[in-house]
């Protein structure tokens, strides 16, 4: 007698396979993980929604404007352990007329309206001896009396560690910021001394900066100090040249 209920799969059965019912196992797992990550990301964003009511300050260095760098000096300084040395003395050689004149002629050759949006003091620190393992320290003060004479060396008290690239950058802009100047080059050429006092220090801080290390030995530091001007330039009201192109 023939058995109609045979469990042998080869008897009386035909299978037709359609590729649309088959998917790559890797893509299935990736899609599932992608959906899971999206759900988790949406949950995290929802937890941060209450923070939308708060405001944070962005780094002004990354804002719009053209950067013009004035290198004040580059020299080697010796720093003893547990002390910090003054690296900025605004009444000294950092303000030589030759340095400023070359900077103004190279950086602002175009005669148009400009605005000094911010000035950054930038200190680049490098060890002079190889295979030294220490970190750079820095401390600065923006506000001080005009007749204040800073100490050349101070003790280390709550300093800041210099960040990535051993660069220490400080914004010198006062509250409100900005220094609109009509034709910066002519302002400088009229009177060098009045330009520094009236334009720069009336609108920006004359700060004090101290540099040190956390080393237990005396270290030699290659210090490069520069001022970085963030300048906004305005287009002239009328074309500089008249012709078919205009």
Swiss-Prot record:
Keywords: Viral occlusion body. GO terms for cellular component: viral occlusion body. The keyword DNA-binding does not apply. InterPro entries: Polyhedrin. Signal peptide: none annotated. GO terms for molecular function: structural molecule activity. It holds the Pfam family Polyhedrin. Major component of the virus occlusion bodies, which are large proteinaceous structures (polyhedra), that protect the virus from the outside environment for extended periods until they are ingested by insect larvae. Belongs to the polyhedrin family. This is Polyhedrin. The lineage of its organism: Viruses, Viruses incertae sedis, Naldaviricetes, Lefavirales, Baculoviridae.
């Amino acid at each position: 007698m023939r058995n109609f209920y045979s469990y042998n799969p080869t008897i009386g059965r035909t299978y037709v396979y359609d590729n649309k019912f088959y998917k790559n196992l890797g893509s299935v797992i990736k899609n599932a993980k992608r959906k899971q990550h999206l759900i988790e990301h949406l949950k995290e964003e929802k937890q941060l929604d209450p923070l939308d009511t708060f405001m944070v300050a962005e780094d002004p260095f990354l804002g719009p404007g053209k950067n013009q760098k004035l290198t004040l000096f580059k020299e080697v300084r010796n720093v003893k352990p547990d002390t910090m040395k003054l690296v900025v003395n605004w009444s000294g050689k950092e303000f030589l007329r030759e340095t400023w004149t070359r900077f103004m002629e190279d950086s602002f050759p175009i005669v148009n309206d400009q605005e000094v949006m911010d000035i950054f003091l930038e200190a680049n620190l490098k060890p002079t001896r190889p295979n030294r393992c220490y970190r750079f320290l820095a401390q600065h003060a923006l506000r001080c009396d005009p007749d204040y004479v800073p100490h050349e060396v101070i003790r280390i008290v709550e300093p800041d560690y210099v960040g990535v690239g051993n660069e220490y950058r400080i914004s010198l802009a006062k509250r409100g910021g900005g220094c609109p100047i009509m034709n910066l080059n002519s302002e400088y050429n009229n009177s060098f001394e009045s330009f520094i006092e009236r334009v720069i220090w009336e609108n920006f801080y004359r700060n004090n900066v101290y540099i040190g290390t956390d080393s237990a030995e005396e270290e030699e530091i290659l210090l490069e100090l520069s001022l970085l001007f963030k300048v906004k330039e305005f287009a002239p009201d009328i074309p500089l040249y008249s012709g078919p192109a205009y």
